[in-house]
């Protein structure tokens, strides 16, 4: 009488493990890139939040204000989980004469790895920075970056 096979053979299990290993070899780097892109996007979102502060500062004639946190006055930086965004620059002369796509002289410097979480920043972007120049229409243009282009949002890649 023949006995019925119950379970899997060692070869079948080894094949399954090999297939999982091959899939993981492709999936893990792609996942790490995804994490880095997400964290870079957080920094760009912080810069978007600083647009209103820059506009307020420009009303006073400068890109940077002398904020005082003890009095509740808003400062020139915004800290997220993975990045720190800081307002820099000197306003261009004759702001009212600038075209919409001309830089207004104000910049936002985004430093990755200086956020509130410290060590949980992706190693692919840790200790890198992205400097965005604000245009007269309020949008941003990439001015300089040590962040690899593949991690930048599409709008910044197209707007070099």
Swiss-Prot record:
Transmembrane segments: 8-28
Modified residues (N-methylphenylalanine): 8
Classification via InterPro entries: N_methyl_site, Pilin, Pilin-like, T4P/T2SS_Core
Disulfide topology: 63-106
Keyword Signal belongs to the record: no
Locations listed in the record: Fimbrium; Membrane
Membrane disposition: Single-pass membrane protein
Record-linked Gene3D superfamilies: Glycoprotein, Type 4 Pilin
Pfam families per UniProt: N_methyl (PF07963), Pilin (PF00114)
Propeptide segments, given as residue ranges: 1-7
GO biological process, one term: cell adhesion
Top-level taxon in the UniProt lineage: Bacteria
UniProt keyword list: Disulfide bond, Fimbrium, Membrane, Methylation, Transmembrane, Transmembrane helix
GO cellular component: membrane; pilus
Subunit structure: The pili are polar flexible filaments of about 5.4 nanometers diameter and 2.5 micrometers average length; they consist of only a single polypeptide chain arranged in a helical configuration of five subunits per turn in the assembled pilus.
The protein's role, per its UniProt record: Major component of the type IV fimbriae that plays an essential role in twitching motility, natural transformation, and protease secretion.
Family of the protein in this entry: Belongs to the N-Me-Phe pilin family.
Name recorded for this polypeptide: Type IV major fimbrial protein FimA
Gene this chain is encoded by: fimA
């Amino acid at each position: 009488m023949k006995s019925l096979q119950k379970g899997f053979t060692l070869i079948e299990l080894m094949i399954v493990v090999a297939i999982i290993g091959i899939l993981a070899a492709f999936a893990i780097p792609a996942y790490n890139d995804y994490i880095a892109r997400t964290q870079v996007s957080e920094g760009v979102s912080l810069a978007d939040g600083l647009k209103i502060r820059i506009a307020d500062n420009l009303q006073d004639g400068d890109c940077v204000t002398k904020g005082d946190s003890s009095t509740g006055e808003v400062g020139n930086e915004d800290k997220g989980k993975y990045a720190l965004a800081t307002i820099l620059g000197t306003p261009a002369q004759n702001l009212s004469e600038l075209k919409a796509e001309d830089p207004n002289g104000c910049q936002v410097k985004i430093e990755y790895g200086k956020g509130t979480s410290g060590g949980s920043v992706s190693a692919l972007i840790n200790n890198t920075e992205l400097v965005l120049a604000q245009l007269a229409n309020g949008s941003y243009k990439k001015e300089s970056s040590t962040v690899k282009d593949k991690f930048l949002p599409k709008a910044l890649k197209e707007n070099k």
